């Protein structure tokens, strides 16, 4: 839209609608600032908040307009008449200062054009799917997915005529292409949805292969399905999917980004065009994150690199010890690729192995439960990415609703324990796992 057209829409000039923060400092003497530095102040100007070093928490449901024309202009953005969302603050279902500052900082990690905050990881996923998928469309996804995501696609969207096909997380480019080609025969392929590494098996998806097959099979077509990837297990430190061709990156920000097991949040990062479509859906159904949780996320992002680095170092030491124990069948950890193909995917995509892994014990559910019940430092709880170490039993907990035959096909077995290593002392964690393993022989 031209400047003249925009002025004609509302009769208000853009420059008068809102006090703007100072221009962000992204580089000094030609040196581009790192995300860890930008997390301390990017997107926030203290002079707009009485000099407060940290952003206040804006606990308000609505915002006053400078003029009626300014209000009209803001609503043109909120309703999609003007691309890019509201230029000013309107109503807390649409936007707010805490959310906008946090969204700006999230974008920094992957050099994304834009980002959105949501009330949970699942609300981020659901809002994205509702924005991009229509009745009769087809979704192609990697498998396994987080159980709630599988339920959303198969059980809920399925009721509205949405079909899906999947391929195993470790599939080759040829296998991925065959599934996409089959999906094209069923209807409009609206979305390629990935989760890497897969939850809870820790198998990596070859994102670059998915991009190559998508670009080849849809070359010259008007409608090219975007690729969305759930990067919760590795991002934003150890894997940056946008750099490898993903269009959207989805997070449960509850995990590493929040990092203290004291908030629930989700996020989506990507191009302006796709984020605009998702923003309109978020505005409609009200899945935005609340101001207090957004403020807590800002706090957490300041220490994200420190926490993830420490947890990753701990996990490497703990996994090296675990794999040598007689009670352990195997440890599925990205630092120990099981196949040459997984090693190749890891080399091309990842900068670190993460701190969440799958531990397969010798035995079954009884042995897994005995191990979990004996833990003294690690907490028996679902989730991951917090400062504390967590352990859970996917088959009986997060993936309980998955049919038995599908769990078997996806290697979600009764002897599997999922562990997320935290920031404790690594040797203390090893001592805890050692005494717990003794409970099963």
Regions found by a protein language model. Name each.
Residues 1-86:
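N-terminal glycine-rich, Lys/His-bearing helix-loop that initiates the first secondary-structure elements
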Residues 8-30, 39-48, 114-327, 332:
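Conserved PLP-enzyme active-site core in the AAT-like
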Residues 109, 322-326, 375:
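Acidic-histidine catalytic/liganding microenvironments
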């Amino acid at each position: 839209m031209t400047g003249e057209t925009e002025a004609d829409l509302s009769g208000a000039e853009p420059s008068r609608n809102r006090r703007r923060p100072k221009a962000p400092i992204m580089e000094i003497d030609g040196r581009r600032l790192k995300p860890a530095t930008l997390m301390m102040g990017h997107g926030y100007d203290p002079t707009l908040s009485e000099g407060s070093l940290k952003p206040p928490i804006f606990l308000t449901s609505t915002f006053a307009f400078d003029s009626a024309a300014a209000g009209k202009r803001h609503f043109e953005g909120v309703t999609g008449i003007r691309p890019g969302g509201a230029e000013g603050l309107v109503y807390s279902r649409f936007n707010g200062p805490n959310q906008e500052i946090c969204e700006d900082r999230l974008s920094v990690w992957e050099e994304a054009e834009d980002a959105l905050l949501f009330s949970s990881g699942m609300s981020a996923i659901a809002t994205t799917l509702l924005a991009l998928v229509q009745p009769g469309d087809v979704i192609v996804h990697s498998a396994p997915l987080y159980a709630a995501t599988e339920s959303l696609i198969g059980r809920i969207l399925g009721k509205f005529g949405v079909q899906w096909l999947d391929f195993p997380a470790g599939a080759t480019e040829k296998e991925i292409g065959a599934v996409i080609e089959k999906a094209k025969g069923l209807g409009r392929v609206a979305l390629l949805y990935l989760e890497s590494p897969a939850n809870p098996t820790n198998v990596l998806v070859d994102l670059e292969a998915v991009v190559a097959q998508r670009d080849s099979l849809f070359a010259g077509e008007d409608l090219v399905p975007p690729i969305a990837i759930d990067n919760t297990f590795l991002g934003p430190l150890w894997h940056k999917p946008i750099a490898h061709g993903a269009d959207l990156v989805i997070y449960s920000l509850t995990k590493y980004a929040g990092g203290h097991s004291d908030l629930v949040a989700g996020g989506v990062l990507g191009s302006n065009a796709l984020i605009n479509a998702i923003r309109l859906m978020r505005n409609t159904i009200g899945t935005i994150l609340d101001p207090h949780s957004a403020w807590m996320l800002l706090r957490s992002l300041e220490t994200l690199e420190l926490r993830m680095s420490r947890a990753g170092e701990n996990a490497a030491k703990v996994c090296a010890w675990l794999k040598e124990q007689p009670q352990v069948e195997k440890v599925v950890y990205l630092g120990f690729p099981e196949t040459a193909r997984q090693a190749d995917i890891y080399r091309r995509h990842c900068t670190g192995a993460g701190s969440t892994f799958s531990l397969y014990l010798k035995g079954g559910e009884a042995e897994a439960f005995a191990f979990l019940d004996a833990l003294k430092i690690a907490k028996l709880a679902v989730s991951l990415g917090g400062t504390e170490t967590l352990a859970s039993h996917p088959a009986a907990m997060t993936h309980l609703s998955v049919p038995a035959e599908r769990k078997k096909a996806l290697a979600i077995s009764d002897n599997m324990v999922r562990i997320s290593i935290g920031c404790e002392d690594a040797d203390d964690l090893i001592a805890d796992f050692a005494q717990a393993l003794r409970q099963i022989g």
